[in-house]
Regions:
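A nucleotide-sugar donor-handling region in carbohydrate enzymes
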Residues: 137-208, 238-240
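Donor-nucleotide binding loops and adjacent catalytic segments primarily
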Residues: 182-269
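C-terminal alpha-helical cap of glycosyltransferases
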Residues: 347-367
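A short helix-loop-beta-strand connector motif used in the catalytic cores of GNAT acetyltransferases and
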Residues: 410-423
Length: 510
């Protein structure tokens, strides 16, 4: 499966489009796809991130490489849509690879570009990523991770509201944020007074909002702040100036440039001042409360929606030292209220949801089968399945568990960071699939699956296991099947598992 991604970065565009496409490409690569980026070499780009991620990169040269910040996103292309589409088509054709999937993430591109590309590659699956909802699209799938966005908002633009993934549940952030979420939430739940402040204004910060905030912080006193950590991207043109300001600050300031451990840093910090954009959803996933700074006109919708929900929002062009002091004071005073608000905005599972909507694995009826991570809210549903006769028939322990024991068991599984616990969905929740680590083994897991009685015989189990193999193709999976469970024996053999004993099957992943 070949995937071509079209996205850009620059002083004006920032780094967010490339970063979220990289997150998506890494997940697709793990699922077996071959991903190729096509980007323009604008001034202030982060194309090095693509090559560092070991992805092939084809560059469209630009006419104007001056380092001027441009506000209007329609001008970010440095050219017209039809020429860009033809250049894209030409580079794809030169690769001699059929584009099974095309992904485009660019505020300067819309239906005009998509129509040209679709006409040239009509069999390709076209995925459009957008946040603005201000122009028409004609892709096969549209992803808009804007907070409180709904598919219906695209009705007047696209002529329909179908096949749209809308809202922060589809935020394309790196899976490490979901992995560290519980640890971060638990740590911050015990904080009485926040002391460690993170300051991050995006990967470029062409307007030097970071410097402005540092100047303002010098004018106010927050005795609780023990340390300020400033995060800058490699493309930030003001890094030297900001480093000098940090050294002169009355606060203990550390400046970090071009980091690769954002999730770990968010785990360690108590609160933040941060730009709107992809890092907003990263902060929320980690339960890191923040003063959110709107740094671009195209962030107004997100800013308004967050403010209406109770989040703290400032406009980069308008706020002063007094307003920053009030915002930080409010955050410190209402710390846990803001912490809970943040963690409820985004759970960090967007990437796994999006991948399953791009790569379809249907049951016999053609309906896509997906997995979502189980939570405490699923305890009763799982118990209902545990009590069904078909579940007990082939379980190691045929006795129905007591409810209190089930709750304790499931909570321990959810708290175990090494266990993968999923709910199977086929239009609605219909089963459970779990991967438990095998003792004294490295990257070896035992699979367990059970469905509701009404879901048997529909190909759902087969699709769910295929989905599990897709999401976890870097581990060894072991299946233990009772001798009399003939259907499961046939299922695992059909899916390519190797029988290693009368009751055990194994599949090794590369």
């Amino acid at each position: 499966m070949n995937v071509f991604l079209r996205a850009d970065s620059s002083l004006s565009i920032g780094s967010g489009h490339i970063i979220r496409c990289l997150n998506l490409a890494k997940a697709l690569k793990k699922a077996g796809a071959h991903c190729i980026f096509i980007s323009k070499n604008h001034h202030g780009n982060i194309l090095g991130k693509i090559t560092q991620g070991n992805f092939p990169l084809k560059v469209i040269p630009v006419l104007d490489r001056t380092g001027i910040y441009v506000r209007d996103e329609k001008s970010w292309l440095d050219g017209n849509q039809s020429d860009d589409a033809e250049q894209f088509v030409s580079l794809v054709s030169e690769s001699c690879l059929f584009p099974d999937i095309i992904i485009v993430d660019h505020y300067s591109l819309d239906r005009e570009w998509e129509t040209i590309v679709k006409a040239r590659f009509p069999e390709s699956y076209l995925v459009v990523i957008d946040d603005l909802c201000n122009r028409p699209h004609c892709g096969d799938l549209l992803i808009d991770q804007t907070y409180q966005r709904t598919a219906k908002e695209y009705l007047n633009l696209n002529g329909n509201d179908g096949n749209i993934l809308a809202g922060t549940k589809f935020a394309l952030i790196h899976p490490i944020f979901a992995q560290l979420r519980n640890q971060s939430v638990s740590r911050k739940a015990n904080i009485t007074l926040p002391k460690k402040l993170m300051l991050t204004m995006g990967g470029v910060d062409a307007q030097n909002i970071t410097g402005k905030i540092l100047d303002f912080l010098e004018q106010v006193d927050f005795d609780n702040i023990e340390k300020i950590t400033i995060i800058l991207g490699a493309a930030c043109p003001h890094s030297a100036e900001i480093s000098t300001l940090g050294k002169k600050s009355k606060y203990c300031v550390e400046v970090l440039i071009n980091i690769s451990n954002m999730a770990e840093l968010m785990l360690e910090h108590d609160f933040a001042i941060g730009a709107m954009g992809g890092t907003t959803w990263e902060r929320c996933a980690m339960g890191l409360p923040a003063v959110n700074i709107a740094i671009a006109d195209n962030q107004r919708t997100i800013a308004n929606n967050l403010a209406e929900a109770g989040a703290i929002v400032l406009n980069a062009e308008k706020f002063n030292a007094s307003e920053l002091r009030c915002a930080l004071t409010h955050l410190i005073t209402h710390y846990h209220e803001q912490r809970l608000l943040a963690m409820n905005i985004c759970d960090g599972q967007g990437l796994i949801r999006v991948i399953q909507e791009i790569i379809l694995i249907p049951a016999k009826d053609g309906i896509n089968v997906t997995l979502r991570k189980a939570s405490c809210n699923d305890i009763d549903f799982v118990y209902q399945l545990q009590c069904e006769p078909k579940t007990r028939q082939f379980a190691r322990n045929p006795e129905i568990p007591e409810y209190k024991n089930h709750v304790k068991w499931m909570q321990s599984k959810l708290d175990n960071g090494n266990t993968f616990f999923y709910i199977i969905e086929h239009d609605e929740e219909c089963g459970v699939i779990r991967l438990d680590p095998v003792e004294n083994s490295v990257a070896k897991y035992e699979i367990s699956i059970f469905l509701s009685s009404s879901s048997h015989g529909k190909g759902i189990a087969s699709a769910a296991i295929k989905r599990t193999l897709m999401l976890h193709n870097d581990i060894v999976i072991l299946a233990t099947v009772l001798p009399e469970n003939y259907a499961s024996h046939q299922l695992f053999e059909r899916l390519g598992f190797l029988k290693i004993s009368p009751s055990e099957y194994i599949i090794e992943r590369k």
